[in-house]
Amino acid sequence: QIRHIHSSKIFNRQELDMQKLTDWAGNTSWGFVEGFPLTGDNCAKSMYLIQKYMVEKTRLGIPIFTVAESLHGAVHDGATIYPQNIALGSTFNPELARKKAQMISDDLHSMGFRQVLSPCIDVVRDLRWGRVEESYGEDPYLCGLFGIEEVSGYLENGISPMLKHYGPHGNPLSGLNLASVECGLRDLHEIYLKPFEMVVKNTGILAVMSTYNSWNHIPNSASHYLLTDILRDEWGFKGYVYSDWGAVAMLKDFQHTAKDDSEAAIQALTAGVDLEASSNCYWALEQLIEQGRFDEKYVDLAVGRILRVKFELGLFE
């Protein structure tokens, strides 16, 4: 449940390779899968076959979360594309975000997806940053209002949105993506975390994506303070945290707070990252537990959070 199947492992261009799926997944239940290379027409059939395999061929028969990227429309040929968030933010009309999410939900359902990696409510404070278009703007309150509307639009239509990118992100040093955001506690809470707090406290959001950069050179995806003390204990978030792609592996390959996969997995999971996306450090956890080097309770907590959301969204029905 705490691992993610990358589409590159099981697809041959536009075709799902059932042998690859069998070899990769085995009889193990997985948390999530995406189909980024697929056209919209091919998505529904492929997602159905993957779900059928997970329910009928794995030991526990737990449904998998089918995941799509959709900052301004599903990232699949044939889907409708809408203006980027920075354009919507410029209208100062948050209701547009709700309408956008409602219409995107129709596309997602038709393609077999239940989880969407959106909305992005990063507060942008450096125009040199290459991801400015993903956000609604520079004002925390405005970003929060748009986030509330977009999340509500998805939830009303049976799609689980994912709030991203949690942790200071939109003002990296020199405007460089992945660079650390430098600020004190006041700016952290009043600027960068404010829209996330607004959405968590005013919607039924069940998924949050942690960033792969750092705050004051401490990786956000290894920060117990951000992911547990603030998000869960202070704000009352009850869902799961999904790593930005490669964030766990970056702890060893980029930020160098971990020397290997085992240390990266321990740092991320104990901080509060429930699901590792696009890397395989969490594979080391089974051996760590068998050797008595890691407490299984952290895996139980993460699995429980993910299963709870799957039940709430009706995946078992």
Annotate each language-model stretch with its function:
Residues Q1-E317:
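Glycoside hydrolase catalytic-domain context in secreted enzymes
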